[in-house]
Amino acid sequence: MKISVIGFGLLLCASSSAMAIGLNAEQSKNTSVLDAEIGRSSGGLYVDGQWIKNTTDGVQIGQAGTGYNLEIGPVMLTAGVKAAYIGGKKGDNGVAFPVGGGVKINLPANFALYGEGYSAPEQLTNSVKNFVEANGGVSWSPVDPLVLKVGYRYAGVDGKDGRPGHTLIDGPYIGGGLTF
């Protein structure tokens, strides 16, 4: 128990730098995304929330997550967990708790490559066999606090109890945001 408390205390100390607040929006042909985060763009602990809507069939995903960012030079590694509400249209409405991580590689001229993936097996969901989401792309920050993004997002489920597996979100997007 003491080791856990000491370890958690060290993580808090390592992440005690100023935490930036970010607001982002993404749009694709069939998807709208709104995202708010605290501490996601710097090393240490972070929290974020996200709402994703497939504008074609009305599927919605609402998420809140937390995790830890580890900066190693120009690379930031992320490990995290989310609580996600899946508002599917094929009888798969429910909750999932995906676990995953990501990587961001800072490049010259304020460009960056990023990617992340999260998965929740049947034990961490109540309505589907598996929930998977992935997101990756390129970002550019021409001036602080503006960030512009181009990427690809996927989210899908494997059905359970006779319901078919299907794709919830799938496609390229453009986006932008502000980080204060």
Report each predicted region and the residues it spans.
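Gram-negative outer-membrane beta-barrel proteins
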Residues: 53-57, 72, 85-91, 121-125, ...
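Residue-level signature of outer-membrane beta-barrel architecture
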Residues: 38-40, 68-70, 103-105, 140, ...
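Short glycine/proline- and aromatic-enriched beta-strand/turn motifs that initiate or cap beta-hairpins
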Residues: 18-68, 175
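Outer-membrane beta-barrel "beta-signal"
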Residues: 138-142, 167-180
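Cleavable N-terminal export/targeting peptides
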Residues: 1-22
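Repeated loop/turn-to-beta-strand initiation elements of outer-membrane beta-barrel proteins
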Residues: 42-47, 72-79, 109-115, 140, ...
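Residues that define the transmembrane beta-barrel architecture of outer-membrane proteins
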Residues: 30-34, 41-43, 58-64, 75, ...
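Transmembrane beta-barrel strands of outer-membrane/channel proteins
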Residues: 23-29, 47-53, 79-85, 101, ...
